[in-house]
Regions:
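A short, conserved, highly charged catalytic patch centered on acidic carboxylates
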Residues: 1-130, 138-154
Length: 154
């Protein structure tokens, strides 16, 4: 991944903005990955495709959609879902200056709960510090482990 500023990423997003607003949320996961998620990762955030392994086998849990590689480490796993999966949390449930705890997210969005559990299982299997989920339109990230905290507190 090359260095970029938030302004450069925003300018890159603006070039692709119509793709996001016009996307059919009933599309399947593969189409969501091709048209939205890959656009964010490779065209907007400028990750190199050689730094991302797709469908990486993670022993028993299954296959991680995106595993990011930096040197010999895997710093991030991202689990993809189709655009129609909603990770919605009611605006009055959250504070703008604090992260959303997993327990609130799980209560408000079963789709987000199931995707985060899946991503955390993959990340834990690979020894990855961060896990994320996306439907191409919403992106959520968490630490896979924080000493002294349960998953509900993260």
């Amino acid at each position: 991944m090359s260095e970029w500023t938030p302004e450069e990423a925003y300018a890159a997003f603006k070039k692709h903005e119509a793709r996001f607003s016009d996307f059919d949320i009933e599309s399947n996961e593969a189409q969501t990955r091709l048209e939205l998620i890959d656009t964010v990762l490779f065209d907007i955030l400028d990750w190199e495709k050689g730094q991302v392994e797709v469908e990486k086998h993670c022993r028993e849990p299954g296959y991680a959609d995106y595993v990011f590689i930096v040197g010999s480490r895997f710093p991030l796993v991202v689990e993809a879902k189709r655009a129609g999966k909603n990770f919605f949390v009611k605006p009055n449930s959250i504070s703008s200056d604090r992260p959303v705890p997993f327990s609130l997210l799980a209560k408000e969005s079963p789709d987000a709960k199931s995707a985060l559990v899946q991503a955390i299982m993959y990340a834990t299997t690979l020894g990855t510090q961060f896990a994320g989920i996306t439907n191409g339109l919403q992106w959520l990230f968490t630490l896979t482990f924080v000493e002294g905290q349960t998953i509900d507190d993260r």
